[in-house]
């Protein structure tokens, strides 16, 4: 088996989020977010009726988890501040919430881990959703204020900041595909949400730059965005209509955000096609100047699977709204049957090559990558250890393609695995387990290393992928 050497300064870490791990959802002054509200109103929408309440009990077990991450050879990890924990309903600092994050960041430094901090991970405070959510300019301004409070409260503690995790997902899952609460099917409203998130990002970056200039943020800090930059593919011998489907899918999902964070603008061809399709974005005078402030220092790329599309059978969907692409099922696809996702490690290499071609100055890292397996407990051996060689194979293959991309000039600086410790995953709850570390829900959220943990430690320590 071939060996691949990653650079000595290539970092390894864990990816997680506040709403998926922290627990204590209504303690310490925390307000409800949409996941809490949906759990209260319709617990049956969650796998095995496990709602948002406990996460993986991280607030009670953070010291143990930080030690475990360090013991596995990691030197960084990413989490998120919960908007609904940091601020009260008047936009003022919740001192108890702030104290928790100060303690977490202190303990992280003590453990020898550099925390990467994201400000938003699909966790809109419910009271703001009731005011219109991301369809409202008021909420855009509220987010910019929240970001400013966070930068100034933790600015001397945090080196790496991120405005959003996967900003394309809420427009799709909540407003377009009807998967998450409020379970809407409205392509046009989804694009309004996407546009307003773009403005919120840019306003947050502007607040960060201002705080930086005023010395409220440490001098070596960087700010970025994290998105699922999923390469878009089509048939081997595509028609012009197939290529048009690729252009629009990649344009909405990928180029929209890449152009925003590198150029401070949105792709003109995508905006033109949306307008031709009858999608009216809520442009206002001065918006272009706001978007220009959205350029960041670097980028996180979440990657689990590719996107494959073909020309749509109809350009209007069943709800009478624009439809730019149908799914294309590649006959040679290797699937993770638990998740229904294609496993295609080359996608990370292709993303790196696209950056070299179209965004040559952009530094990035793999901010999420992982494999979730259903009923993983069935793979437990006689000693109680989950045998998960499939996880080793998955990560090895992806890291091999990362190493190839770096060797060809990609500016990829590190790798965060999702999620090193099993965590709660939205409506799927604990259906699919991702971790190198098991969380036993039947035994007080007890942590146990899986077989793959030893391999992770070896790779993170040696930077050799074999």
What feature does the model see in each segment?
Residues 61-82, 294-298, 358:
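Catalytic domains of carbohydrate-active enzymes, especially glycoside hydrolases
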Residues 32-67, 72:
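Aromatic- and Gly/Pro-rich amphipathic surface segment
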Residues 1-46, 89-90, 99-466:
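Active-site region of glycoside hydrolase catalytic domains
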Residues 81-95:
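Glycine-rich, proline-tolerant flexible connector loops at the mouths of alpha/beta enzymes
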Residues 9-11, 59, 76:
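A common structural microfeature
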Residues 57-64, 72, 81, 96-103, ...:
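Generic alpha-helix structural propensity
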Residues 75, 84-86, 122-124:
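A short acidic, glycine/proline-enriched capping/turn motif at secondary-structure boundaries
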Residues 51-58, 90-93, 139:
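Short secondary-structure transition/capping motifs
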């Amino acid at each position: 088996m071939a060996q691949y050497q990653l650079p000595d300064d290539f970092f390894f870490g864990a990816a997680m989020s506040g709403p998926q791990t922290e627990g204590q959802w209504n303690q310490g002054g925390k307000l409800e977010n949409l996941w809490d509200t949906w759990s209260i109103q319709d617990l049956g929408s969650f796998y095995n009726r496990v709602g948002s309440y406990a996460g993986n009990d991280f607030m009670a077990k953070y010291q143990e988890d930080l030690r475990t991450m360090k013991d596995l050879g990691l030197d960084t990890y990413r989490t998120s501040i919960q908007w609904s924990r940091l601020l009260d309903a008047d936009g003022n600092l919740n001192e108890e919430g702030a104290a928790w994050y100060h303690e977490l960041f202190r303990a992280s430094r003590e453990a020898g881990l550099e925390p990467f901090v994201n400000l938003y991970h699909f966790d809109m405070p419910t009271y703001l959703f009731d005011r219109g959510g991301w369809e409202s300019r008021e909420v855009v301004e509220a987010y910019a204020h929240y970001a400013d409070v966070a930068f100034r409260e933790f600015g001397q503690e945090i080196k790496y900041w991120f405005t959003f995790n996967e900003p394309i997902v809420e427009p799709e899952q909540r407003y377009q595909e009807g998967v998450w609460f409020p379970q809407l099917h409205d392509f046009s409203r989804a694009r309004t949400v996407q546009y307003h998130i773009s403005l919120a990002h840019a306003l947050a970056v502007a607040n960060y730059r201002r705080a930086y200039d005023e010395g409220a943020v440490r001098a070596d800090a960087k700010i970025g965005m994290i998105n699922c930059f999923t390469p878009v593919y089509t048939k081997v011998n595509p028609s012009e209509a197939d290529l048009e489907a690729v252009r629009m899918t990649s344009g909405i999902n990928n180029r929209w955000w890449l152009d925003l964070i590198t150029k401070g603008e949105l792709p003109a061809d995508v905006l033109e096609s949306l307008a031709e399709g009858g999608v009216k974005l809520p442009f206002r005078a001065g918006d272009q100047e706001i978007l220009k402030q959205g350029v960041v220092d670097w980028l996180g790329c979440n990657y689990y699977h590719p996107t494959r599309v073909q020309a749509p059978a109809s350009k209007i969907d069943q709800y009478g709204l624009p439809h730019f692409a149908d799914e294309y099922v590649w006959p040679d696809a290797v699937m993770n049957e638990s998740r229904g996702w294609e496993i295609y490690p080359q996608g990370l290499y292709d993303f790196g090559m696209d950056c070299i071609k179209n965004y040559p100055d952009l530094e990035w890292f793999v901010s999420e990558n992982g494999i979730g397996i259903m009923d993983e407990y069935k793979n437990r051996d006689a000693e109680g250890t989950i045998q998960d060689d499939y996880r080793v194979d998955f990560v090895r293959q992806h890291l091999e393609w990362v190493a190839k991309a770096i060797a060809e000039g990609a500016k990829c600086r590190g790798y965060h695995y999702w999620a090193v410790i099993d965590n709660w995953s939205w409506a799927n709850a604990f259906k699919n387990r991702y971790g190198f570390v098991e969380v036993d829900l039947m035994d007080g959220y007890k942590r146990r290393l899986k077989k793959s943990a030893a391999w992770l430690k070896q790779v993170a320590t040696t930077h050799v992928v074999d």
